[in-house]
Amino acid sequence: MSKTVVRKNESLEDALRRFKRTVSKSGTIQEVRKREFYEKPSVKRKKKSEAARKRKW
C-alpha cells in the first residue's frame, strides 16, 4: 500500500503528484484493473502465451 505524508510547506497538489507517482511505480492500478473481473485459467494461459509470442517477434 502506498503511503505519502504531506511535508512541511508542501502544497496538496505536490503531495498528490508524489502519491500518484508512487502508486504508478508500484503497479497498484494495473493490478486492480487486472483483477477487476474473474479470468478463467485457460484464458490466462492464452494471454500469457500471446504476450510471450509478441515479445519474441
UniProtKB/Swiss-Prot annotation:
GO cellular component, one term: ribonucleoprotein complex
Keyword Electron transport: no
GO molecular function: structural constituent of ribosome
Source species, domain of life: Bacteria
InterPro entries in alphabetical order: Ribosomal_bS21, Ribosomal_bS21_CS, Ribosomal_bS21_sf
Alphabetized Gene3D superfamilies for the sequence: Ribosomal protein S8
Gene Ontology biological-process annotations: translation
Spans traversing the lipid bilayer: none
Record keywords, A-Z: Ribonucleoprotein, Ribosomal protein
HAMAP family cross-referenced by the UniProt entry: Ribosomal_bS21
Family, per entry: Belongs to the bacterial ribosomal protein bS21 family.
Name the record gives this protein: Small ribosomal subunit protein bS21
UniProt organism field: Lysinibacillus sphaericus (strain C3-41)
Native organism taxonomy: Bacteria, Bacillati, Bacillota, Bacilli, Bacillales
